[in-house]
Design a protein with these regions (language model features):
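N-terminal secretory signal peptides that target proteins for export/translocation
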Residues: 1-12
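Bacterial N-terminal signal peptides
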Residues: 15-27
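Sec/Tat signal peptide C-region and signal peptidase I cleavage site
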Residues: 27-33
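Long beta-strand-rich cores associated with HINT superfamily self-processing modules
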Residues: 488-513
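N-terminal lobe/hinge region of extracytoplasmic solute-binding protein
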Residues: 39-89, 117-120, 188-189
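Residue-level recognition of beta-strand termini and adjacent short loop/turns
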Residues: 89-90, 144-146, 200
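Surface-exposed binding/hinge segments that line
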Residues: 6, 97, 131-175
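Extracytoplasmic/periplasmic ligand-capture domains
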Residues: 73, 99-129, 139-141, 187, ...
């Protein structure tokens, strides 16, 4: 019997209805190795790399949009659309040699002019979430057809790591100009698969691009991405043969899956974090709640949380306890700011000093099973200190829009992380940065963030990051809880998955056994 559930009912509490269109799409591909079927934990946001910001969107982009460079299993920068690069002697320019023979999905040539268009679009387009990532890039020079130079206002150590993600994704200038603000409805990139269709909350279908420069590495004709919130339903469909890969397997299912000879589990420690973001200045709403306007209340909340217990209860041990934007095992972890231990007595004392022994706030939470479980754990732990936490379950894309507007008290936010720590830090604490949902703004931190970006020597850079950690940790605007393990499950009928630390599924090299 085919297990196929409507997007409307892909939630923790609903299991019964069937969406015929999705079933038909899936059933048509059953038994055909040429179609790769991937279940996502959420529906991706916009399919435009300039404005996109979801992890699941990055999974789709990995099949759709090639980047200038990529990372490998050891976080080494490796070629993709750029074949080589060299820094200027003063480290204030990066010169990239581009791959010849690459075309976009509309047949247009990829060249230096296309790179210039894309970088400038990332920097100037209204609503761009890449602007902060590329802020040190001042101008882009086309040196010849296949050579481009990125000029910088100051040395920028994370630049190559930035170009290994959405800021380095190249879209067709011709298609972008023609589509305008509607580009995301039919994105045109240069990756191994081209866009075919999207049905919101149901499926994204990509078809093989025959003109792909590395087509020998592609062994499927089609990729179908299906958002299914409930991990139980994702797993049931994998076991029934409807899916080939599922992401974010529920940690509680890992033990049982180890005995299933048909299924392979991949575990990848994430580069990012699970955090609790608090609105301290994003909007007027921050001043309407004790949590937003009094740092003592925020410190009390942090002291009410038992991180090791949280990892065991909400993640079944499939995460590493943390308190910063990178994990304690990362070379850029600031050891001068250790993980705080739970202290209920001190938390109650702080609330008493703040004059709010029983503060109440809403916790905006994704509708995923993991998100709901974590919110309930936080609710129970915080209650012991006197907090009344009201869980506000919100669809993921909607939660991002509300966070943008500052319409929240606190927000459970997963950040998938970047190869360079700057990607976990700059856009979240810089005064005018697009991912600064909490409204944190300190000129001294802005100066340190810029200084950190300009230093390439690791030991010197760590000293700057330690200063940033010392300041931000006292504000408790983002409570870093833990660092998850990306848990992928797949049929053993397919081989070739690479365990890259960003947790993304790369289709190059995947093939049926």
């Amino acid at each position: 019997m085919t297990l196929c559930f409507s997007a409307k009912y892909r939630s923790v509490s609903r299991y019964a209805m069937v969406l015929l269109a999705t079933c038909a799409a899936l059933s048509a591909s059953v038994g055909h190795a040429q179609t790769l079927r991937v279940a996502l934990a959420e529906d991706p946001d916009v399919l435009d790399p300039t404005v996109a910001r979801s992890f699941v969107g990055r999974i789709v982009f990995a099949s759709l949009c090639d980047k200038l460079v990529d990372i490998d299993e050891k976080l080494t920068i490796v070629p993709q659309l750029a074949t080589s690069w060299v820094w200027a002697p003063d480290n204030k320019a990066l010169i990239l040699k581009l791959r010849k023979g690459v075309t976009f999905h509309d047949g247009e040539k990829f060249d230096a002019a296309a790179v210039k268009f894309n970088i400038e679009r990332h920097k100037t387009m209204a609503g761009s979430n890449r602007r902060g990532e590329l802020s040190p890039v001042t101008t882009v020079d086309v040196l010849d057809d296949m050579t481009v130079r990125l000029n910088l206002s100051q040395p920028f150590a994370p630049l190559l790591a930035v170009l290994a993600d959405r800021a380095g994704m190249m879209i067709s200038p011709k298609a972008a100009a023609a589509a305008g603000s509607n580009f995301a409805n039919k994105p045109v990139c240069s990756g191994p698969f081209k866009f075919h269709e999207r049905v919101a909350q149901d499926r994204i279908v990509l078809e093989r691009y025959d003109g792909y420069w590395d087509k020998a590495s592609i062994h499927f004709d089609k990729v179908i991405f299906l958002p299914i919130i409930d991990p139980t339903v994702r797993l049931a469909n994998l076991r029934s043969g409807q899916f080939d890969f599922i992401e974010r397997v529920s940690p509680s299912d890992i033990t049982a899956l180890k005995t299933d000879s048909r299924i392979k589990i991949s575990r990848i420690p994430e580069l990012g974090y699970q955090g609790l973001s608090i609105n301290i200045g994003k909007s007027d709403q921050a001043q309407k709640n004790p949590l937003g306007k009094d740092v003592r209340v925020r410190e009390a909340l942090e002291l009410a949380l038992d991180r090791p217990g949280m990892v065991q209860v909400s993640m079944d041990g499939e995460a590493d306890v943390g308190n910063q934007w990178v994990s304690p095992s990362n070379p850029y972890y600031a050891k001068n700011v250790p993980i705080p231990k739970r202290n209920i007595a001190r938390a109650k004392q702080l609330l008493k000093e703040a004059g709010v022994p029983n503060p109440s706030f809403s916790l905006m939470t994704p509708t995923t099973a993991d998100g709901q479980r974590l919110a309930q754990v936080i609710q129970a732990m915080a209650k012991e200190a006197g907090f009344d936490v009201k869980i506000q379950s919100t669809e993921f894309a909607t939660s991002l829009n509300l966070a943008d507007k500052g319409q929240f008290d606190a927000y459970l936010l997963n950040w998938s992380g970047r190869a360079d720590p700057d990607g976990n830090l700059y856009s979240f604490y810089g005064c005018k940065q697009p991912l600064n949902y909490v409204g944190f703004c300190k000129p001294e931190v802005d100066a340190l963030l810029d200084k950190s970006r300009s230093v390439r020597e690791p030991a010197e850079r760590l000293k700057i990051i330690e200063q940033i950690a010392a300041i931000t940790s006292k504000e408790h605007a983002i409570l870093y809880l833990y660092h998850r393990h990306w848990l992928w499950a797949q049929t053993k009928k397919i081989s070739g998955m690479r365990l890259i630390p960003d947790g993304l599924l790369r289709v190059q090299g995947l093939k049926p056994n």
